[in-house]
Amino acid sequence: VLYSLNDTKKSDAVLKGIQNDIIEQVGESAFNIGFSGGLDSTALAAISADVLKRDKVTLVHVIYGPYTYSKTLENVLTLSEKLRLSLRIINMRQVQEKVLKNGPACNRCTRKVKIAGVRKTIKDKNTLVGTGANLSDSWGDYGMKMLNGIYAPFLDIGKDEIRRFLTHYSIKEEEVKIGESKFREGCKAKHLLKLMAVPRYHGHSVCLSNEILLDILSQTGIKPDIANVKIVGPLKKNIALINISPLPQAGITDEIVLRLKKIETVDEVILVDAPLELKVKANPSIFRSATARARLEAGPLGRDFADKTSIHWEESPNNKLHTFHVVDCRKKQEA
């Protein structure tokens, strides 16, 4: 990536400000960084390794069992070694499954699973928890860099600036990517757009289908902007929606469809090559809020799909559903 001289000078000034802020806020305290191995947490780890005593910095990777991409763990191990920082791995699979039992809930998962997992490693009350949360995250809504012992030094900056930090520390963007998305990556569980009522059925389908998808694309050398398998449908039927953008040649997509059809917990496979209509049941607190519905339409029900989506909302009488559930879908051309 090429930047102008003015961009470089501005970036250097921003980086210097972040470095000074970390030195001032952390000081001699222990600093445990929630480390996903992604863009944001890697940039924070690199800066911290540069300006703090290394023995005061610990990278904490919260693993979700099979819901963690294998490439994620590979990146975490490689980067922690490259940065020469100690690494702790905390397994929070069962907690995550419990959180998602009542429907998709990424923000709640961040609080109850990811941050809670990092907090488990704290032995000294003066230890700070570091997060790479920035302007692109909902965390930014709080507008506070320091909140309840959690420190977010990137809160006022965006992704472009953070990418420049990586360049400054000679870390290539490929080192922090897993191939799921050019934009925002995470765990496999976020692609389950229904209640995780039975992990061995609902969880198994989203784990295996997404791992197979990335494995096939990796073998072919394809690096799409979006690559995921969303699992939707009623509780007793798992419908796998294959999202790849741009769409590769038919031979590759045919192989992906064939492989996914062999998964025992996948009941139907659909390649998203046209706009989709999604039938979504929602908790009353979401259904009755235009703002909440709009956020979901722009986020998990719109972002990371290979084509446009239109949503038909219904209020759910199921008191076990705390968020939303995509109960059905069809391609618009079939309407």
Please identify what each model-predicted range represents.
Residues 7-9, 38, 205-211, 242, ...:
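Intrinsic-disorder/low-complexity, polar/charged segments
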Residues 244-270:
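Short, non-transmembrane amphipathic alpha-helical segments
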Residues 163-228, 269-283, 289-302:
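Mid-to-C-terminal catalytic subdomains of enzymes
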Residues 132, 243-245, 272-274:
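Generic beta-strand/beta-sheet core signal
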Residues 142, 228-234:
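Short, flexible, solvent-exposed loop/turn segments with mixed acidic/basic and small polar residues
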Residues 1-168, 240, 257-266, 278-335:
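ATP-dependent adenylation/nucleotidyltransferase module used to activate substrates
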Residues 111, 206-213, 249-257:
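Generic alpha-helical secondary structure
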Residues 59, 233-246:
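Short, aliphatic-rich beta-strand segments
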